């Protein structure tokens, strides 16, 4: 009996680890107010993150997880974790002025205790000061919509997804993103689906399925990999929508 329990325990651990994502603590200094605080950094993950349900919103781990948006508990400066330490010096004064207007409901000792959508709302204004391109904003509002949805704020989630949709359309008409239409049309389909426009979503999925993804800035193997992933995901998405309609 003990052997069976032990074997089952090992099987459980192996199953858990196959899909596990891990974080570890690391101290960072806020580039605005110089406050030192313990944040979380990525430990481990695998390709399984691209097969989680958030793929239907074209949002992936780590941005689906709470530690991914850093926020200084003192001045409330907030960005994605990978941008936190690389803020241009010439933006600090403007950021300081903006952050002086940010008022939270209470003081937080740990950044993880600050609601994710609150951090994203601050980060939205921070990134407006820093300046970002259409692709960034298209993704940012998908992420924001995802987290509003997680908090069951359907109205805010829809607002964010409509913004993502607007940026995706801008990308579609911009020659900078030439060759990436398959991915952009998929994003448009995904956002349409999550604002309740399922018929439009299916139309855009059909359009995307006829294309091949291209990106001259990437290695050929990476381009091929994303194209194959999108092809498979489009098929899955059509089935996903049909199943939703049957429920």
Roles of regions detected by a PLM:
Residues 4-16:
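Sec-dependent N-terminal signal peptides
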Residues 18-97:
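N-terminal cysteine/histidine-rich coordination modules
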Residues 92-152, 179-194, 232, 236:
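Amphipathic alpha-helical repeat scaffolds of TPR domains
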Residues 123, 127-130, 167-175, 211-215:
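Alpha-helical junction/boundary sensor with strong preference for TPR arrays
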Residues 198-216:
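TPR/TPR-like (Sel1-like) alpha-helical repeat modules
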Residues 216-247:
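Terminal, low-structured helical/coil segments at or just beyond the last alpha-helical repeat
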